[in-house]
Amino acid sequence: MIELQGRKIALIGGAGFIGHNLALTLAEMGAEVHAVDSLQVNNLGAFSNSHEDANKALYLHFIHDRLRLLQEAQIPLHVVDARDYHVLSRCLNDMKPDTIVQLAAIAHANRANKDPYSTFDHSLRTLENALDCARGLKARFIYFSSSMVYGNFDGEAVTEERHCEPLGIY
């Protein structure tokens, strides 16, 4: 198993579904984890300010629960918009992580395809900024993607050797 004791890890998109679960697991394994999230996409800001949605109360409950779990685990949450290079760079330079994990993205294929500009802005812009910050800090970089990049595939699993055939911008 990888030794994480004493490693400082920044999770960009760390308050999302995968991000908060990863943060909790890494912290349990001894890493010093920092969640970096704007709380704008697939998150508190998006749902609390949205129009009436039948699932709004449920989504808000999930989001509040994520934030509570991060707080209880004493994982710092840096509310930072990773689309702004200067703000993200300042945050990460102050933090000095050993590893940066990029999780920030529009997490719903239908929403992503309906608003490609926002998807590009929240997914690729944050990726570009995170990569540049990692290079400057000489930090390891891990990028989380989605099985959606492989398109429709047969079977239960797909390997990284499979050719990418994305069906949309997501």
Where are these regions (language model features)?
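N-terminal Rossmann-like NAD(P)+-binding domain of SDR-like oxidoreductases, especially those catalyzing
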Residues: 1-170
